[in-house]
């Protein structure tokens, strides 16, 4: 598994909460295990204490994404470095479970399970993956969805660094909202214009008044 894959751990954890909507799915041991994904042995070690630990880490990781989205690269890096120091990783070379066409192991870097607890292991993995993406792709690849009130975190892997939303659904919703806002503004401007026009003359009220004054003179 490539290190870049582990960055999704950070995204999944941050997006387990939607503060603006009052939604939090990280409320049980089962929710913690689901974060790890299928087939992860570390998930079996999860306990009630890991719920609280991961919710604390979640807030710190969200701060990394928000700093990056605000263009504050130094703050984003400092926040992530603090997490990396607190939750160090144990890298190992792995490959026995993956073979090439000749049956030889496909060696790759793997992050070993953390000895302390399930949440520490998850955090170390998430932070290492995020750090890899940040250094390889750039801090500006970390973003927060612009579709109000979503604010989900995402990693921009587009070729032109143009991503603004966490999903196609949010992009569509934002585009529809922008279209309706433009349409509403156009209607309001048209209505105001009609109000100041003098019926039957095509002149605005100010122009009609000036024309009348000139005629009296």
Stretches with model-predicted labels:
Residues 173-184:
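Short metal-binding segments enriched for Cys and/or His
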Residues 1-144, 148-155, 186-217:
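Short helix-coil boundary/hinge micro-motifs
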Residues 143-146, 162, 180:
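A structural preference for long, well-packed, hydrophobic secondary-structure segments
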């Amino acid at each position: 598994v490539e290190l870049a894959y582990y960055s999704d751990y950070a995204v999944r954890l941050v997006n387990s909460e939607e503060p603006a909507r009052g939604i939090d799915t990280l409320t049980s041991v089962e929710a913690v295990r689901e974060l790890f994904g299928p087939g992860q042995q570390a998930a079996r070690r999860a306990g009630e204490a890991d719920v609280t630990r991961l919710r604390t880490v979640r807030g710190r990781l969200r701060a990394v994404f928000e700093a990056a989205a605000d263009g504050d690269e130094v703050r984003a890096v400092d926040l992530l470095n603090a997490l990396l120091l607190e939750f160090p990783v144990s890298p190992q070379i792995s490959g026995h479970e993956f073979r090439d066409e000749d049956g030889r192991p496909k060696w790759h870097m793997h992050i070993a399970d953390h000895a302390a607890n399930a949440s520490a292991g998850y955090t170390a993995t998430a932070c290492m993956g995020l750090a890899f993406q940040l250094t390889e792709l750039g801090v500006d690849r970390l973003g927060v969805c612009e579709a109000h009130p979503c604010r989900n975190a995402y990693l921009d892997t587009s070729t032109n660094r143009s991503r603004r939303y966490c999903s196609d659904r949010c992009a569509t919703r934002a585009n529809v909202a922008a279209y309706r806002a433009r349409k509403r503004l156009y209607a309001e401007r048209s209505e105001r214009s009609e109000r100041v026009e003098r019926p039957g003359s095509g002149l605005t009220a100010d122009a009609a008044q000036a024309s009348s004054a000139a005629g009296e003179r």
